[in-house]
Amino acid sequence: MASHQYHQIANLLEKMTSTDKDFRFMATNDLMTELQKDSIILDDESEKKVVRMVLKLLEDKNGEVQNLAVKCLGPLVNKVKEIQVETIVDSLCANMMSNTEQLRDISSIGLKTVIAELPQSSNSLAPNVCQRITGKLSTAIEKEDVSVKLESLDILADLLSRFGEFLVPFHSTILKALMPQLASSRQAVRKRTIVALSFLLIQANSNAYNGVIDHLLDGLENPPNPAAIRTYIQCLASICRQAGHRLCNHIDRSMLLLSQYSQRDDDELREFCLQACEAFVMRCPDAINPHIPMILELCLNYITYDPNYNYETDDGDTGNAMDTEDDEYVDSEEYSDDDDMSWKVRRAAAKCLEVLISTRQELVEDFYRSLSPALIARFKEREENVKSDIFHAYVALLKNTRLTDDVANDHDSMDQVSGPTSLLIEQLPLIVKAIQPLMREKSMKTRQDCFLLLRELLNSLPGALGPYLDSIVPGISYSLNDKSSTSNMKIESLGFLYSLLQGHPPHVFHPHIPLLVPLVVTSVFDPFYKIATEALLVLQQLVKVIRPLEPNAAKSDFDAPSFVGQVYSCTLQKLKVTDVDQEVKERAIACMGQIIANMGDMLQNELAVCLPIFMERLKNEVTRLSSVKALTLIAASSLRIDLTPILHDVLPALGTFLRKNHRALKLHSLDLINKIVINYSSNFEANLLQTAIVEIPPLISDSDLHVAQYSLTLLSTVARRQPQALVGIHEQFLRSVLILVRSPLLQGSALNCTLELFQALVQTQLSGLDYHSLVSKLMAPVLGGNGDVKSRATAGAPSEVVQLHKQAYHSSAKCIAALTQQCPQVATPLATKLITDLQKRNDTEIIFCLLTIGEIGRHFDLSSIQVLPQTIIECFGATSEDVKAAASHALGAVSVGSLQTYLPLILHEIEVQPKRQYLLLHSLKEVISSLSVSPSGLAQLLPSVPSIWDQLFKHCECSEEGSRNVVAECLGKLVLVNPDELLPQLQQALRSESATMRTVVVSSVKFTISDQPQPIDVLLKQNIGEFLFALRDPEPQVRRVALVAFNSAVHNKPSLVRDLLPTLLPWLYSETKVKSELIREVEMGPFKHTVDDGLDIRKAAFECMYTLLEQGLDRVDVMQFLDHVQAGLCDHYDIKMLTYLMTARLAILCPDKVLLRLDQFIQQLRDTCTHKVKANSVKQEYEKQDELKRSALRAVSALSQIPKANKNQQLVDFLKSIKETPELNKIFEYIQKDSITGSSDIIVMDQS
């Protein structure tokens, strides 16, 4: 293989010496192909020959050959040894000094290629190359030849950006060459010098950095000439963008000079001053704070700076502007002047304002007062690009005004956020008035910006544009009718119209329907498929507006029938056409489904034409899913559309879909069958339905509980609506259901659907589905032949006992209790039999019997069974922990059904049985939890609350932590029952001198907070601060539970703590720090082990911070928040894992702020990814490090998605380093692939 390669390379080298340029070209091209192969291996001699030949071809007379030779350098440097790379670099550097311009140019391109391809791994190649190039480039920069100087500066900038850390020893040499170039007479030289200098200062030591900054600031204080002022200000801005965090110490001096120079009568200088301000605001957020008012004033002055144009002629009434001729809107361009540079000043001011708004969320209210009116007034800006930047600045303001759902829905907290929102509402008429004429400008960009702003306005103030539709709709019409509108313009217009229709009640659009319908219909027939697709989506929404069916839709005398024919015929034409784009087909199907669902009663004669088309589309694989979704809309419609013509074909087809390996199709098919059975069961025979439901048994599996849940719901519906369809097939699906009941994964909504199914089945009174048969089948896997309720022989159930997961016992018990609810007469006999036989059974049988008794007792009064309580309590003494837990659960559950009998017993036992206290407290918790969820349960529980409360308080300081935790939960749940009386008692207990008592009391508050509205909420909001102020408690255990309670409040009901955040956050941040007083050494034989008692508190603090990301970030100083996240990146393994998650989330929630700290984040993530575990470490250490790497790389992946992150050199270099490290690259590729995998298709199930 190798000899073949050598021979092939030798042949290529020989052809490269040919006099025929075509031979040379083809040989060079073939060489490049060979070099790109991973398998190529060159010996030393071949390397030398190839390098020598490629370098020779750089001097070829033919330009195409030269270009190919340059391209060969990239793969070549990764295939040859270091000495050959040095030869290449030396040769290219020498050629850069050549007298031949073409050779100089091709050599500089070659050097850039080599630098771009050098690996960033830890070998010596890159440092050696940097060492060889740097001196020569520094010398070249000092040459008089401008072209050499420019190329050298370019290459040096590349070198510094990629390998800055290797060039630190040469900084003094480089600076010596660069600094004089800032005074060059050539602007191009000065600009490239600034770029190189900015990259250099990223890695420079403090002395070098401060030296350069001082040089620039001294130069600004005593400038040699006007050009130097511009250069130094540009340089400051550029340095700030690259290494801004280090400029903070010089901000005050810099801003003083900028404020002076910004007043000079020099437009270019003003522009540079504003750009520098933008960089300072972005990169030095804390240091720039005192100067924000000055920057704001500067921007407001210069955003209106237009000395060569008089706007007064445009300041008249714009209200009637929509009625004027189009020519009125071309005036602004006529005043453009090639010599007028003032637009650059205005643009710089607008961009600076956008950054200011984006990074200063805490000033939003002030911005609405001072900045918003000024921006609105500048919407009339004559220069298109400046106007666009002004719009984007206002969009940034709107984005910062968005309300979280929690705050928007919480009336108690609206006063906290109504400032910006109310100011925006006040200014809404001004915004619409300013935008109205712009929506008919000829400039596409301006119109698109109008729609962008209006759409963001909808996000900030949902439903607020209703009163202004008279001003907005004609603008939409203009863009859709304008023949000069581009496709993007039309798509943007339709997209905004869709958002508008979605975000407002239907009745507000009724006056505009005569204009909107023809507009949208015309767009549906647009030849460009993307416009047609978008138009069909809008038309579907328009159907819901023309004829709303929602129960809460306002009554209207709107004449809907007059538009039905037009909408239907338009959609039908699109539905019939087959040779169109897939998206158009799908949208046409969806639109027609909506039309029939909302207007089908007005289209009786057309249904015979339209419905068969759906049947045809069901047969086509690519339109199948869309058709099922559309038919589901129709079947669920309150109009009860007559589907008889197609039902006999649809149901068998849906049955075949259930066999397909297509999850979304299965889910939607099950949902459609369910809707058909609910609304049309009288329209077809049971045997037709059987063709579909016979396919259900394989779908009832714990491998996909969501599909299983839909299947169970459908069977329940069939059992209630058309039970005859189950005859002959119930054994198959029942077998699957019984296997599912034994699954450890069955819980929540899937378990509830299973219970409903059993109740529906027993009501059918079909053979084999009677109570005794079903109960026997459920008991058989546990009790075998001993569990027969009647004659087990007739039930046909297997008698062998199966080893089950403990969750399966709970599920089976609940199923038996659900069946018993339908046959109440057997409840007491069954419970009696189970309790009587308890002594004869093994542990697993006892667990199952106890759980079953408990679940039956939850629904029935079992107090007539005399031996029941004592038998259950005796099980508390069992050796098996699982038996004890089941007994505890059973005692609590049977107490729910007969509270007066069993609650006094539990309270008495807690008093006299200290060894069984933990189990009895769990029984009590079961009672409180079960009865406090319904009004009838609360009525039962309320009289007993005082006695329960007193008993619980006696055990707040018991020695066992587990018991204290249960006491805390019970106290919290009891407070919800009677908050007015019990919450003050908790507050009183908070003043206890006992740290244990305080811990239990603070912990109990967590259980008073739920994500649903509760009567206690108002009271809790007034008093929760007293409990959370326990974050200052001297005892670590109290602070930890206070953090947990704080976390619960932020997660479930942020409005409770929103006002307290300024006070609580400093205490929270304090708990994220490592505290030396909580670290101790423990001797374990000859070894000393360090124990950090503060770790659990720090974990609780970081968990609380993570929750704040989702719920309270609008009230948090993000930059301060980031400080503590970054500190956590260097903490213990558990903390690191949390902060990696937070980093990834922050990259999505506040990308602009994270971008400012990207360098620091990348450095810490790089340290984790490159960390090596010690050779003699245990396996667990390797696993931990692998998990850290995976989590760190997930954070890197999220950071890399931030807009403009690809301009951060540290990130770019790190990503390249990851790709060059096989181990990291494999993980990273998997993460990226995983992140773009679409989530499965979830649909909302209507179980009515």
UniProtKB/Swiss-Prot annotation:
Keywords tagged on the record: Repeat, Ubl conjugation pathway
Pfam families: TIP120
Xref: InterPro entries: ARM-like (IPR011989), ARM-type_fold (IPR016024), CAND1/CAND2 (IPR039852), TATA-bd_TIP120 (IPR013932)
Consequences of knocking out this gene: Lethality in the pupal stage. Accumulation of neddylated Cul3 and stabilization of the Cul3 adapter protein HIB. Enhances protein degradation of Cubitus interruptus (Ci), suggesting that Cul3-RING ligase activity is enhanced in the absence of Cand1.
One annotated Gene Ontology cellular component of this protein: nucleus
Signal peptide (from-to): none
Repeat (HEAT) residue spans along the chain: 44-82, 127-165, 168-206, 365-403, 425-463, 510-548, 604-642, 644-682, 861-900, 976-1014, 1054-1093
Keyword Plastid in annotation: no
Keyword Repeat assigned: yes
A Gene Ontology biological process term: negative regulation of protein neddylation
Function, as annotated: Key assembly factor of SCF (SKP1-CUL1-F-box protein) E3 ubiquitin ligase complexes that promotes the exchange of the substrate-recognition F-box subunit in SCF complexes, thereby playing a key role in the cellular repertoire of SCF complexes. Acts as a F-box protein exchange factor. Probably plays a similar role in other cullin-RING E3 ubiquitin ligase complexes.
PANTHER family reported for this sequence: TIP120 (PTHR12696)
Entry's family note: Belongs to the CAND family.
Name of the protein described by the UniProt record: Cullin-associated NEDD8-dissociated protein 1
Organism: Drosophila melanogaster (Fruit fly)
Lineage, highest ranks first: Eukaryota, Metazoa, Ecdysozoa, Arthropoda, Hexapoda
